[in-house]
């Protein structure tokens, strides 16, 4: 287990109101990574599990944008809107809640289910149909699901 510090903002829970999902203005969240965590994230032989979609976004932002010395800590802001088609750089698994419709968090899950392709929605609908049929609880304090990234 390795730590990252993330200042989650209210924007995480702001629903998408734009006509086109891609036009949604994404909020920024500050994060901090210590050198040990950076080293683990940069090691391609490691299997990485992110707890929560905000951690997924933080890790992916770090891997895509940070080229600082691995021996020094990183403080940055992630303003990354992950949606299909998105190819993940460093998260292999994600433990996350069942999110409400119209959220950026749900878009991230759809992208995780269809790496690099725009077709994560059918699989997402199948999973959520089963969750509704089995009375799973949704949103931040509800039930969770473990997602495995299907590397291409």
Language-model features: where?
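Surface-exposed, charge/polar-rich loops and edge strands
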Residues: 1-152
